[in-house]
């Protein structure tokens, strides 16, 4: 949808772009989208072009932070190669912009072929499958006790 939109139509904030750390938070951007849609009369009142323009504007603001902070972190930690991976690597504009920024700054850059971009959950599931295949007598996986709210322990 964002590919069909005008990324400049709705100027949106790029949260934490100028913070000195390398953290990300898109809560301000999400709130800006919420208010924008509300001010335009609600989602059901938006035509397809406006939806595409909002998506493109959101993508533009989000990627600006992601690309900028990635390059700054690579410089700061003296990284030689930037690797784009995980589900986010399927975003065509991110692939283009991060590759260009890395080249301009003199970093080696790598990303998977588009057909290999996938959600992190799929990668974790595949790793679990291979681990189970390597050691099938590791127990009955159907009797696992799963706690989705398990906290981290020291």
Regions found by a protein language model. Give the residues of each.
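Active-site metal-binding loops of divalent metal-dependent hydrolases
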Residues: 87-88, 114
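Glycine-rich phosphate-binding/hydrolytic loop that grips phosphoryl groups
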Residues: 112-153
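A contiguous, well-structured pocket-lining segment that forms one wall/lid of small-molecule binding clefts
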Residues: 1-82, 91-105, 132-135, 154
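Conserved phosphate-binding/catalytic loops in two-lobed NTP-binding clefts
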Residues: 82, 99-124
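Short, conserved alpha-helical segments within structured domains
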Residues: 50, 90, 117-121
């Amino acid at each position: 949808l964002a590919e069909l939109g005008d990324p400049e139509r709705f100027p949106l904030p790029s949260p934490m772009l100028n913070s000195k750390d390398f953290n990300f938070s898109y809560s301000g951007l999400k709130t800006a989208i919420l208010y924008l849609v509300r001010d335009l009369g609600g989602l059901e009142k938006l035509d397809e072009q406006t939806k595409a323009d909002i998506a493109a504007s959101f993508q533009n603001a989000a990627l600006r932070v992601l690309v900028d902070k990635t390059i700054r972190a690579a410089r700061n930690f003296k990284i030689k190669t930037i690797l784009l991976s995980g589900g986010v690597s399927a975003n065509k504009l991110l692939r283009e912009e991060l590759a260009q920024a890395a080249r301009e700054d003199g970093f080696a850059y790598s990303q998977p072929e588009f057909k290999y971009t996938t959600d992190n959950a799929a990668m974790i599931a595949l790793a679990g499958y291979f681990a189970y295949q390597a050691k099938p007598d590791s127990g009955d996986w159907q009797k696992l006790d799963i706690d989705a709210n398990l906290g981290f322990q020291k």
